[in-house]
Amino acid sequence: METLASLYNEHLSTLQQRTRDVLERHQLDALLIHSGELQRLFLDDRDYPFKVNPQFKAWVPVTEVPNCWLWVDGVNTPKLWFYSPVDYWHSVEPLPDSFWTKNIDVQPLLNADDIAQQLPVQRERVAYIGYAQQRAQALGFSAENINPQPVLDYLHYYRSYKTDYELACMREAQKTAVVGHRAAYEAFQSGMSEFDINLAYLMATGHRDTDVPYDNIVALNEHSAVLHYTILQHQPPAEIRSFLIDAGAEYNGYAADLTRTYTADRDSDFAALISDLNTEQLALIDTIKSGERYTDYHVQMHQRIAKLLRTHNLVTGISEEAMVEQGITCPFLPHGLGHPLGLQVHDTAGFMQDDKGTNLNAPSKYPYLRCTRVLQPRMVLTIEPGLYFIDSLLAPWRIGEFSKHFNWDRIDALKPYGGIRIEDNIVIHDKRVENMTRDLKLA
């Protein structure tokens, strides 16, 4: 088995090739990629938690250090100016010495402003990639060379195709997230509050709240009907009926994004609904293959939701086909099937059809779908169908010609459980689909 160092070396070669291509296409000499800067809280002397530029961590697994800079030209060894000030107020990261540093020219940067003296004087054909546009302007970059859209489009498009190094990192992130999910399930079983379940997850994964790739969703009972619920109640409800956890982890800057739903009563109707949605999710994954458009699988999932609505007597007197055609499945599954995953949880280029940035929007019927790409080998995506009981979405259906098909008594009986979401992370290969999540036996 190849070591992470050898995989990184191959990864770097791929990035160098992409850099040569994009520089040649846009008549540039180099890219200057900025890790980012600390952002000060308004009227305060503290900063927001630092979040690194994803284009920076694509090159080096440095995720917590601001004021770092990468100079890449696709030919010479990438040069990293690593921010290493003399500071007794804050901890300072030592110069890195790891599996990746033999391939990078690492130089200390004692003061953030010193970067101006380190760069070549002639920068007319250099593009700045980062979010500190005022800093780029101060360094003399013209507006057209600050995050030029054609360059970003190219870089974003090819980020969809993960290298072996990236896939190895994402599998490690999966392992960490699975450990956290198991700890959270045990906390739920013991009757803990949302707040304490979240602490159990963070403890098991070794993450802080600011380290996880997105805000953990830890929802008991009807809270799981809020798609991005992040309140974290400190006290458990008087009766615990259900538990939804949508939580991930990071490894070298790469994300995992997993969701599971559980019920306290394994013999309840809601438990049967969880089991059947799990079956349909796995069955859908079994049909996924390279060369097909992701949008088609989203539509297929709505057909499977219609099947569940019929078999669980939630919608009656209308065919499954008509349910999908009339949009009856939409209030039960209001979000997309999933999204690209990688350096970002909602990774780039979900709608991009080529490296020139050609966009294909989600269908108007399914506006929250986050990916319209044709699936190809090395893409990593989430598959996360849900089935929810959301008052605001169901309310319009209580009147009108289709109201008679909704079993409102049964729907209202399930509303206190909130909803279900089951999410796995998959890798597209030439002849198969790898389910990184299920490979780790997370049921």
UniProtKB/Swiss-Prot annotation:
KW Oxidoreductase (keyword) present: no
Pfam family membership, one: Peptidase_M24
Keywords associated with the record: Dipeptidase, Hydrolase, Manganese, Metal-binding, Metalloprotease, Protease
GO cellular component, one term: cytosol
Enzyme Commission number(s) from the entry: 3.4.13.9
Protein residues bound to Mn(2+) 2: D246, D257, E423
InterPro entries: Creatin/AminoP/Spt16_N, Creatinase/aminopeptidase-like, PepQ_N, Pept_M24, Peptidase_M24B_aminopep-P_CS, X-Pro_dipept-like, X_Pro_dipept
Its job: Splits dipeptides with a prolyl residue in the C-terminal position.
The family this protein is said to belong to: Belongs to the peptidase M24B family. Bacterial-type prolidase subfamily.
HAMAP family in the record: X_Pro_dipeptid
Protein name per the record: Xaa-Pro dipeptidase
Organism: Yersinia pestis
Gene: pepQ
